[in-house]
Amino acid sequence: KNACNSRTHLYYPKAFNYCKEYGLTYMGNTDIHGVYKQTYRTDKQSGPMTIVFAKERSQEGVKEALFAGRSVVKFGDILIGSEKNLLSLVKACLSYEVKEVKGNQALVKVTNKSTLNFEILLDNKAGTILGNATVEIKVRLDDKVKFTTTHITDDSRLVIDIASLR
């Protein structure tokens, strides 16, 4: 009843609430009992994974990051984590350049330096910032961008103020 479907694979959004409420580390895993490549077409998608924000590339670095809660789950095109970690990931992936400002309007060039796709909602208009792509977006400086494929809880998404990008 509480499961959601992402390309025919289930995930449980209520678990995100427990992570936030109890300060738990967000972890992505699978319960496959068969061949991985038969469950996830590895040429088209990957299974659930945990992105770890380690300070160093070592077993101890990964362990320290996980115990400190510095992780984000990637499941299909969905990213799940704390607001702080999702914001860190988005800031690491996307760079912004304000091209021109006229009053409260601006033209912003957004470059996605990652392979992740970001679904956004801006001024009630949906759009996608594809991986390894650059787009120009007209915005109002008092707008907020909602990243609709991010999950902090089952009903909470990452939202960034446009003004904070300047």
Where are these regions (language model features)?
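Charged catalytic cores and adjacent phosphate/nucleic-acid-binding surfaces used
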Residues: K1-R166
